[in-house]
Every structure is written in C-alpha cells, then in structure tokens.
C-alpha cells in the first residue's frame, strides 16, 4: 500500500505517492494522463532502465513520445532545455499536453521549467528515480537551469500535478548517488526534526543496505517536512529558506569546481559542515553538535571538507551571487540546534574567511 502525502496549496495542491512498483500503477497515473498527449523526458542513464516500463504503463492513455537527454548537472542549461521545446514543437503538442519527468533532479528541474514556459504553462508530473530527487527536488515546484555564473539562476516556481516515488528505483542507483541523496535527508533532521536526526544515526546500516521499510520511512518523513514547509511558504519568502541549509556554500563549490564534478549532495554535505562551523564560530552551537553532523555525514561516505583548491575568494565571489542575497547581504541558513535552524543576514565576512580557511 503506497503512502500518500498532500502538498496543500489550494487549487494547486497535489499528492505524493511513496511505495514499491508505483511506476507500474496505471490506475493512479491514469487520473492525470488519460486522453492526454504525453512527452516523457528522461536521460541516457535512466532510459534503458525504466523508460519502456513507464511507456507500457501509459500505453492505453493516449499518444506517448519521449526525449532522451544527456545525463549530468553539466547539461542542465538553456541549450539542453531547448531539446524539450523542440520535441514538443516538432510533434505539435499543445496546451493539453503533459510532460513526465523520469529521472533525477536535473531531469525534474528541466522538465518542470519547460512545462512552466511552454505555451505559458502545461501540466507535468514527477517520477523521480534518485534518492535526492525523491526526498527534495521533485517536491515543492522549484524548477530551473544553471548559468555558468550561478546554479539555478534561471527558473520558476511551478508545481507538478503529482509526484510518484517508486522506491524500487533505488536498487539501480549507484552508491555515490545514494550517498549524495542522504545529504539532503540529513539536512531535514538538522534544520527541522531532531528525532528524525537521531533515527538516522540509529539506522545507518539499514539505509545503506536499502532496507525497504527504512527507506520508505526516511523518504516519507522528508516529504512530510518538505510538504509542510512548502504549504506554509511556496515561494521562499520565509520558512522555506531553511531548506537551503548548506546550499549557499554548496552551490559555490558546484559552480567553482564545474557542474557535475561534485554531485549536488556532496557539495551540500561539505556546505552543511561549513554552515555548522560558522554557527559554532558565532556561538550558536557547541562543538558536540558539529561533531554529530560530521559523523553522520561521514557514516554515509559523504565529504565533510570543501575542495582544497577553493580559498575564501573562490567561495565569496559565488556566495555574493546567491539567490538569497538581499540588499547586498549574504544570507546564510545556520543550525541553532539539532532540529532547528535560522536565517542570518549579517554574518561578518571575516568570520566566513576564518571558517573557510580553517576548514
């Protein structure tokens, strides 16, 4: 029996389904796709694994086409976004069409942004296939592509019709990608739920061995938190900013090192440690909390230090372009306890320099 979580946004509310074999659940999918013209957007890694299965599930719904993109963060740009528009236009797809995002965070972000733009908005659904996309990027309506000068700088808030999370996809996920997803899972515990953080500490081996019950619980709890936050603050004017814990530092790492060289979750992991160390420098938390965060990230084989090649100037030039900057002030999400975080807008750059140089 699939778990269901509702993202409550009035007329734009939608369900998240979490369970096994959901990509073969034609009954659920038919509610959103029956008699529609469907374009499945996927990538060259996911297509051999799941494209035919999804096509077979949707075979009776209507016209189905697909577009297969290159795999990787380095392809999340306007040039490759255009491939989706070209596929839609070549097939004369109109406003009654639906895009299906079948893949990880890159595919979900690009498909959602394409849906937001095409003919000023068409429906799309999310079928995330990586842990990171299942617990984070597929929920909440953030869609975007990257620019060479900054991550996710060109995008829109645009909600899906439904999110289908099939946990069986994780059986084919490379270990490095699974670890990257765990960085976002751990983030939820740090910024929102201390009990969940402790549960993660106690269930490392169950999660790493892909225990179904543990995975469903972890994914469900993350989606519950994300749904709660998004329902309160869809466009990140307040509490939703807390979901960016580790991301200001992390996005700087991704941009500086070249998109795709560090996975998003790896950069977030290192960024989360830098955020915790900044909080410690400001007297917000003590060393024991930093140690718990570092130890849990390390337990999932995640990096806890920034690249040695990055100095303070490398970080700060990217952080000044961060989307959360207001009035020229860098705004950082910092933990104030396990289970709590706040946004700080006046962290001295001298403090950041000390943290980065000593990390």
UniProtKB/Swiss-Prot annotation:
Name it. Answer: 3-dehydroquinate synthase
Q: Write out the similarity annotation.
A: Belongs to the sugar phosphate cyclases superfamily. Dehydroquinate synthase family.
Named cofactor requirement(s): NAD(+); Co(2+); Zn(2+)
Q: Does the keyword rRNA-binding apply?
A: no
EC number of this enzyme: 4.2.3.4
Cellular component terms per the entry's GO annotation: cytoplasm
- Looking at the UniProt entry, the stretches that span the membrane are none
The encoding gene is aroB
Top-level taxon of origin: Bacteria
List the Gene Ontology MF annotations in alphabetical order: 3-dehydroquinate synthase activity; metal ion binding; nucleotide binding
Q: Which BP terms does GO give this entry?
A: amino acid biosynthetic process; aromatic amino acid family biosynthetic process; chorismate biosynthetic process
Explain the purpose of this protein: Catalyzes the conversion of 3-deoxy-D-arabino-heptulosonate 7-phosphate (DAHP) to dehydroquinate (DHQ).
């Amino acid at each position: 029996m699939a778990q269901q979580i509702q993202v409550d946004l009035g007329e734009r509310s939608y369900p998240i389904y979490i369970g096994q074999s959901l990509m073969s659940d034609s009954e659920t999918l038919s509610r959103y796709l029956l008699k529609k013209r469907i374009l499945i957007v996927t990538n060259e890694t996911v297509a051999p694994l799941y494209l035919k299965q999804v096509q077979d599930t949707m075979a009776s719904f209507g016209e189905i086409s697909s577009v297969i993109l290159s795999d990787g963060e380095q392809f999340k740009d306007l040039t490759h976004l255009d491939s989706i528009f070209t596929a839609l236009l070549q097939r004369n797809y109109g406003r009654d069409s639906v895009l299906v995002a079948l893949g990880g965070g890159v595919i979900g972000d690009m498909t959602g942004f394409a849906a937001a733009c095409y003919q000023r908005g068409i429906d799309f659904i999310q079928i995330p296939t990586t842990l990171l996309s299942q617990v984070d990027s597929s929920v909440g309506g953030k869609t975007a592509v990257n620019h060479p000068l900054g991550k996710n700088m060109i995008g829109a808030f645009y909600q899906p019709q439904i999110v289908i999370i099939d946990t069986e996809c994780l059986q084919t996920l490379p270990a490095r990608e699974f670890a990257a997803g765990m960085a976002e899972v751990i983030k939820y515990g740090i910024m929102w739920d201390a009990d969940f953080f402790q549960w993660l500490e106690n269930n490392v081996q169950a999660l790493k061995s892909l225990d179904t019950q543990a995975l469903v619980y972890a994914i469900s709890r993350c989606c519950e938190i994300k749904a709660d936050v998004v329902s309160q603050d869809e466009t990140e004017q307040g509490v939703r900013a807390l979901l960016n814990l580790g991301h200001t530092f992390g996005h700087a790492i991704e941009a500086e090192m070249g998109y795709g060289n560090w996975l998003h979750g790896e950069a977030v992991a290192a960024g989360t440690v830098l955020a915790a160390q900044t909080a410690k420098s400001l007297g917000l938390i003590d060393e024991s909390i930093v140690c718990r965060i570092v130890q849990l990230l390390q337990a999932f084989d995640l990096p806890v230090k920034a690249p040695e090649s990055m100095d303070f100037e490398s970080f700060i030039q990217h952080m000044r372009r961060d989307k959360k900057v207001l009035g020229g002030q860098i705004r950082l999400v910092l933990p104030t306890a396990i289970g709590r975080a706040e946004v700080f807008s006046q962290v001295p750059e001298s403090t950041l320099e000390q943290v980065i140089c000593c990390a």
